[in-house]
């Protein structure tokens, strides 16, 4: 749909929603993201105060996000009344002890819809408005990963299971098209241009098992990464947190990387992280190893990398290590034991493919320094060098 007639699309969706809902009430879970915001605005134009907007505070949002989103949506020009549902304990209990990425996503999805079911019953709503877009459907149906907002497309009957019908005004659009619709609707730029945030939130950026400590460290690291990288205008940029590194050195990778870079092996380290991450192989989901690399000077400090040379190493890795889903480069470390944080920044139009940002090394060093200052339990910071594919944008 390259030549989308935005104004016609908006009118068509408003009329379609009116025809389906009539005088019935509908509920929408708003997140502050462009997809749910556009869906809410279109529906509000169709049925007015019969739309109930809720923000589910699942404990996996960024610092201060619930109140910020409520204030943005309820203010001029949108005037969407938003109710915050505090469901932190419910979601933490649901995901407690889970480490597999798909298990976490599916558990989140079930709790998300149970929460919406309860709110819909309370508000006497039989319809749910969702901001599902085409990329969500493509990735779930192809088996790459389960998007939390996909139901009927994978055989789940929302009426039978949760008691409501689902309306998806944007399911034929890609992200860049949704932004075009948002601009035409005069949605403020802080919402229309907001970078995507996954439905399961930080739960899938705490890679592996979720603990309160890891989640707290990640929230602080996320704030720093968004603050430091924002001026470079990535399409999406964020931090993720891992338990740490596996005690295994990859000597062959270290040797081969040194040969490719034409430097001494003494200046290279290669290893892997403990947790596995999601990737894409032959158009399907893969779940594999995250490889780490460090390029050091004679004193053991990291050096400003040459991205063109790094691409050679990356290509070598994915040609020779089929179990690998990602390659990350050490930005900085401290000697104390602790968690590992990775920084990811990509450029993309449709979110089906993405290129890494070749960020200035000084920007990454500054971000790492601030993370160490704010996160006492973090000991290493890496930068993700992996495009999509072979990696997904998110780690889980």
Labelled PLM ranges:
Residues 1-396:
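ATP/NTP-dependent adenylation/nucleotidyl-transfer catalytic domains that generate, transfer
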């Amino acid at each position: 749909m390259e030549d989308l007639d935005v104004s016609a699309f908006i009118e068509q969706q408003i009329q379609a929603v009116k025809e389906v809902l009539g005088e019935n009430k509908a509920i929408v879970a708003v997140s502050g993201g462009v997809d749910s915001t556009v869906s809410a605005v279109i529906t509000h134009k169709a049925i007015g105060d019969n739309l109930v907007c809720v923000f589910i505070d699942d404990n996996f949002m960024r610092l201060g996000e619930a109140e910020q989103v409520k204030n943005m949506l309820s203010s001029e020009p949108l005037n969407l009344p938003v109710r915050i549902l505090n469901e932190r304990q419910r979601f933490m209990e649901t995901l407690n002890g889970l480490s597999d990425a798909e298990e976490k996503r599916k558990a989140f999805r079930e709790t998300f819809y149970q929460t919406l079911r309860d709110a819909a019953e309370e508000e006497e709503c039989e319809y749910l408005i969702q901001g599902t877009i085409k990329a969500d459907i493509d990735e779930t149906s192809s088996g790459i990963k389960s998007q939390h907002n996909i139901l009927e497309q994978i055989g789940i009957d929302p009426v039978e299971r949760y008691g409501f019908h689902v309306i998806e005004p944007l399911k034929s659009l890609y992200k860049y098209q949704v932004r075009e619709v948002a601009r035409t609707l005069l949605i403020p730029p802080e919402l229309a241009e907001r970078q995507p945030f996954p439905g399961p939130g930080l739960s899938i950026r705490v890679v592996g098992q979720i603990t309160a400590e890891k989640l707290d460290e990640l929230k602080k690291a996320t704030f720093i990464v968004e603050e430091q990288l924002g001026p470079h205008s990535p399409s999406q940029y964020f931090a993720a947190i891992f338990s740490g590194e596996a005690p295994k050195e990859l000597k062959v990778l270290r040797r081969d990387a040194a040969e490719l870079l034409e430097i001494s092996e003494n200046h290279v380290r290669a290893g892997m992280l403990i947790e596995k991450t999601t990737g894409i192989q032959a158009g399907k989901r893969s779940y594999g190893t995250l490889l780490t690399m460090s390029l050091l000077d004679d004193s053991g400090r990291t050096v400003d990398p040459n991205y063109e040379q790094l691409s050679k190493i990356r290509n070598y890795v994915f040609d020779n290590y089929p179990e690998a889903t990602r390659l990350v480069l050490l930005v900085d470390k401290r000697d104390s034991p602790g968690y590992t944080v990775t920084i990811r920044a990509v450029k993309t139009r449709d979110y089906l493919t993405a290129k890494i940002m070749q960020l200035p090394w000084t920007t990454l060093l500054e971000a790492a320094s601030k993370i160490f200052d704010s996160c006492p339990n973090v000991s290493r910071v890496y930068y993700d060098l992996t495009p999509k594919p072979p990696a997904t944008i998110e780690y889980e």
